[in-house]
A protein has these predicted regions:
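Glycine-rich, charged/polar anion/phosphate-binding loops
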Residues: 20-23, 36-37, 84-86, 104-107
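Double-stranded beta-helix
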Residues: 42-105
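Conserved double-stranded beta-helix
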Residues: 1-51
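Feature marks short, surface-exposed loop/turn motifs that line or immediately flank catalytic pockets
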Residues: 9, 43, 58, 126-128
Length: 154
């Protein structure tokens, strides 16, 4: 569905605030999975990922929608701050694959080191799930969303 190259440059690579990927790529039923490939070592100094183990069981907290051309971040029920006392860093060497459940809260800090921290991410959804029409990320008619079934293009 979506891929990104993330270039967290030395000294200027900014913080990515706590979020759940399902907020931005919602399906019915929820099915987004993130694959985060470490193209370089990721550690505390250069802004590694942090996660909140088990929080994905609590459901999706927010939804980013496109309505009449306007983007909106909406709360899904009562939204309390994440309990950050349970956060853990994911320090990983180059070449590591981190798999993220779509409801797992995660973030990364500023790169305070003299080294870059580059990563490649790929977000996938289930072919049996419905990609919602008001998700912020939509493809135009010249580039429709395509699914794979049994490894073959549909």
């Amino acid at each position: 569905l979506q891929s990104m190259l993330i270039f967290k440059q030395p000294g200027i690579g900014g913080e990515v605030t706590w979020h759940q990927d399902g907020t931005f790529l919602l399906t019915e039923p929820q099915s987004v999975t993130g694959f985060w490939f470490a193209l370089e070592d990721a550690d505390l100094d250069n802004g590694c990922l942090w996660v909140l183990p088990g929080e994905h069981h609590k459901g999706l907290r927010q939804r980013f929608r496109r309505i009449d051309g306007t983007l909106r971040l909406e709360d899904l029920g009562a939204v309390e701050p994440f309990d950050l006392r349970r956060k853990i860093p994911l320090e990983v060497p180059q070449g590591t694959l981190v798999v993220l459940h779509g409801r797992l809260p995660h973030y990364s800090e500023v790169n305070r080191s003299a080294r870059s921290r580059h990563a490649y991410t790929l977000h996938t959804i289930s072919a049996s799930a419905t990609y919602l029409a008001d998700n912020w990320l939509q493809r135009g008619p010249d580039m429709p969303l395509r699914y794979l079934s049994s490894g073959e293009p549909v």
